[in-house]
């Protein structure tokens, strides 16, 4: 594998996908970032509950797929000078990172055992502006519970009724609720509960602009897709049509 890409774009992608990496995980491969080089560069971080993917432009001279230690790779790229970075692998399981006169060599793992991150292509979906989603999360996330004895309250409930998105958070003492107008949907009573951790990471990436975020939900997962990012999280409560949430009554 060999590619050349801009340091600032690579650094941003690493910073984003690293948020899903659990450095204390007992499974070594999940401590790393998966790098797929083809027409573009795709980077993925996951701990199975939360997965984050970022795609950036790169000049790919030789395609390939590897796993690199998230912490080490992040530290190296962050310290490199601005400009184009060349990354190349060899047959000794080493990855060569060079920028101007600075060079680093680190080990990499095969990506063969990395879990497949399945995107949600055929679920129920709605669209919302990035700024609106950011504001509604910011206005309600403070009331999410930290008490793991009631895990359902460690997330926010999303409810979609036609052209209204309602987000509710409650920790047993405080309740935060906010409604947001969204483009018309066919749903009347679609609801699901998103973990606070996923919302925290999403909040760090969302921008205060009119970028369209597509939110797709199916069974026990939700996907937020916008720009070059995809965030997939397990739900705390399976999504449902109509009626009240069993746990949020």
What are these regions (language model features)?
Residues 1-249:
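Structural preference for solvent-exposed beta-strand-turn elements
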